[in-house]
């Protein structure tokens, strides 16, 4: 499929934004209709989940190749139990309707909770969920330029 038609197809399937999944029917529909789905499990009061949603909103707009959704784990006990979600936030990476990776908490990004959109993007790129990681590449380049300025 040509890139333009593929982007239109992705957009019609909800790609390009972070959507809330409210029930298991929606969850399984999203998983079935998109090749790559990145699911954030959190709850409304979780501050780290809120930060993650902000980063994922940015990434969803930049990466049409994956569908980004979030689930309130407290309101979706069936899905949460089925996927063995035991820590919030948790990111579940689904490819071809199968769980490929699961990241419990923030330790794989940055245990302090202070991470950039680029760091999350890089993790998802390494997982094979995103085709490239331009935000991460830009952040690394900016750091290298800052270090070069300090050394001069």
Could you describe each region identified by the protein language model?
Residues 29-30, 55-62, 79-82, 90, ...:
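Alpha-helical recognition domains of nuclear gene-regulatory proteins
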């Amino acid at each position: 499929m040509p890139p333009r038609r593929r982007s239109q197809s992705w957009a019609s399937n909800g790609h390009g934004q972070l959507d809330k999944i409210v029930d298991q029917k929606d969850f399984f529909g999203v998983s079935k209709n998109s090749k790559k789905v990145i699911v954030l499990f959190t709850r409304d009061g979780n501050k780290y989940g809120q930060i993650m949603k902000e980063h994922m909103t940015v990434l969803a707009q930049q990466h049409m190749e994956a569908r980004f959704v979030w689930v309130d784990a407290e309101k979706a006990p069936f899905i949460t139990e089925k996927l063995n979600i035991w820590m919030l936030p948790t990111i579940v990476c689904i490819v071809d309707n199968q769980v490929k990776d699961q990241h419990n908490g923030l330790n794989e990004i940055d245990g302090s909770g202070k991470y950039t959109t680029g760091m999350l993007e890089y993790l998802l790129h390494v997982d094979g969920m995103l085709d490239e990681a331009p935000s991460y590449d830009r952040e690394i380049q900016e750091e290298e330029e800052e270090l070069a300025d300090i050394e001069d």
